[in-house]
């Protein structure tokens, strides 16, 4: 439930596109070429006057480092707009897809709108005519739900603090197995019933097995980045549908407000569990759990991208089983073989390390609660489309503001408070003000 940039340190040597590179990262070749040496000042000045504009158009990255000579005026603002907007879009697309899947399911499959049970974390029912009793039950359900989330988060942080990577990895694998197999089987069965599509059980089991097996490989081992992102979106949508179905209506709204406050405290407080988790991962130079984080970054590891040794000059090392026990990569997962690039011409003996991941990372909890808010807006009451679209736009506006603050402060920030606050305000204002106004206009056949 946090958003953060993939950076190991708050002290950067570069800005704009490479602002996420830490001070310990090796300087790229383009940056080194742009810095004049003491012995070639005249040649640098000549190169600056003759080729600055041409090289800027062909390769803007060579001016990405601060202090590079010959940077044209306005290039910094152009790169900020280009790559800042790119990061926003790279998060808008998955969040939008997740919410679209949830809303489409709510509008078409009646199973997820039928109230025939509750979660064990919300034992108090709201089937009472008394408004006060219903409000009290929703508050009690919220306290129990938030307490469970706090305890499990602290438990996860303690396990990670003491390097219990295998236990955490097994925990995440069991959760992924349940989501990718059991919940997918239930979802697919209800969709087939809704659209009256006949399918025999062997074919259904085979489809679920193939879907789940590929998802487990992509999430917990290796696979294309796009496929991994797609499975994380599907997992978030399935979990959101479960919350929408089994959370009581009033309890769901109170839980959304409380979880945004908890997210604010857990990320920004010095001893907050999520902040301690991120800081510990940065100190150890390790990635956050791959099954809990959606990454919008371009990934250069062999596990997520295909490298052609003939064209890239890279050597892919074979997998060594002994590395599984010694490496802490991916929190106890088998290490991904790394690719080492050959020294570039003109730089003999210089060995470039693997380029650092850049981009914005968003927790899957944010996807889930964004979708819960929009799904509840689509499922409760009259299911008015104006209310649903208002919540959808509010979440995207809040996410955009969160990313703006992330670019300003350059540290892990909670992604729920702004979006959830806007979503709740837009929901209740649209449902109680805009919808009655539109209904009145329609009943009197007035058009604006």
From Swiss-Prot:
The chain crosses the membrane at residues 88-108, 139-159, 167-187, 201-221, 224-244, 250-270, 359-379, 389-409. Disulfide bonds: none annotated. The keyword Endoplasmic reticulum applies. GO terms for molecular function: aspartic endopeptidase activity, intramembrane cleaving; endopeptidase activity. The modification Phosphoserine is found at residues 22, 25, 30, 52. The PAL motif is required for normal active site conformation. This is Presenilin-2. It comes from Mus musculus.
């Amino acid at each position: 439930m946090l958003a953060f940039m993939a950076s190991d340190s708050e002290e950067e040597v570069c800005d704009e596109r490479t602002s996420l590179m830490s001070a310990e990262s090796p300087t790229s070749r383009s940056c080194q070429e742009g810095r004049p040496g003491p012995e070639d000042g005249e040649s640098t000045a000549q190169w600056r006057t003759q080729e600055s504009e041409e090289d800027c158009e062909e390769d803007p990255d060579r001016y990405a480092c601060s202090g590079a000579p010959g940077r044209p005026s306005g290039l910094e603002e152009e790169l900020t707009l280009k790559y800042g907007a790119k990061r926003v879009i790279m998060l808008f697309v998955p969040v939008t897809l997740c919410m679209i899947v949830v809303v489409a399911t709510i509008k078409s499959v009646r199973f997820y709108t039928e109230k025939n049970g509750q979660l064990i974390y919300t034992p108090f029912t709201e089937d009472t005519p008394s408004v006060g009793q219903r409000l009290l039950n929703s508050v009690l359900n919220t306290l129990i739900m938030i307490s469970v989330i706090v305890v499990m988060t602290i438990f996860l942080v303690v396990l990670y603090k003491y390097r219990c990577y295998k236990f955490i990895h097994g925990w995440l694998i069991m959760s992924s197995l349940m989501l990718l197999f059991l919940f997918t089987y239930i979802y697919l069965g209800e969709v087939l019933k809704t659209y009256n599509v006949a399918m025999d059980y062997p074919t259904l089991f085979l489809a679920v097995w193939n879907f789940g097996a590929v998802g487990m490989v992509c999430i917990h081992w290796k696979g294309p980045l796009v496929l991994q992102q797609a499975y994380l979106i599907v997992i978030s949508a399935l979990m959101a549908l479960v919350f929408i179905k089994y959370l009581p209506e009033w309890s769901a709204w109170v839980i959304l407000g409380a979880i945004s406050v908890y997210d604010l405290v857990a990320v920004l407080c010095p001893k907050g569990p999520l902040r301690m988790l991120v800081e510990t991962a940065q100190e150890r130079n390790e990635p956050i759990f791959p099954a809990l984080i959606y990454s919008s970054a371009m990934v250069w590891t062999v596990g997520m991208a295909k490298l052609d040794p003939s064209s890239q000059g890279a050597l892919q090392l074979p997998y060594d089983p002994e590395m599984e026990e010694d490496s802490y990569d991916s929190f106890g997962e088998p290490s991904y073989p790394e690719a080492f690039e050959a020294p570039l011409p003109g730089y003999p003996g210089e060995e470039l390390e693997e380029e650092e991941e850049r981009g914005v990372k968003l927790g899957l909890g944010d996807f889930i609660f964004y979708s819960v808010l929009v799904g509840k807006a689509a499922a409760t009451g009259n299911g008015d489309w104006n209310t649903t679209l208002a919540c959808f736009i509010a979440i995207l506006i809040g996410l955009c503001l969160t990313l703006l603050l992330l670019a300003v402060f350059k540290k892990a920030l909670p992604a729920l408070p702004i979006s959830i606050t806007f979503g709740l305000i837009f929901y209740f204002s649209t449902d109680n003000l805009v919808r009655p106004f539109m209904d009145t206009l329609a009943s009197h056949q007035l058009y604006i």
